[in-house]
């Protein structure tokens, strides 16, 4: 991904759009603090639900580096890639997100981001789990993010 930027600004995407995109849709997403990348809810939830850090990617040289794991859900392409790797011969498959994992006593021990399942006549015959990770640097971009939002408030 090529980094689109404003001079001196380390951010590449805010609330799903390049920082130099000010069309109606981009402004709407920023104003409403929305996430266009298949988040579990329409709003961005990165860092804090009421004051989300809507930074999807930052610049590194001439490239953009994804810092939000939800960003990888764009058009669910990641699922097609994972299926071709984990279940290359599957003819019927589906996936579920945010699957709660419990221990032998039924106690919650975590959440799996995505479980891909291969089915045959309504039975699961194979599956694979996917944990999506991205660089997490909320403290390093909170100030540039706030500055951007204040400077380009609508």
Regions flagged by a language model, labelled:
Residues 139-154:
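A solvent-exposed, charged loop/short amphipathic helix patch at secondary-structure junctions
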Residues 1-105, 109-111:
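Nuclease-adjacent, charged terminal/linker segments that flank catalytic cores
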Residues 73, 119, 135:
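Residue-level marker of positions within ordered structural domains that often coincide
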Residues 95, 100, 131-136, 141-142:
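Short loop/turn segments at strand-loop or loop-helix junctions that form parts
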Residues 86-89, 133-134, 148-152:
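Short, low-complexity, polar/charged sequence segments that are solvent-exposed and flexible
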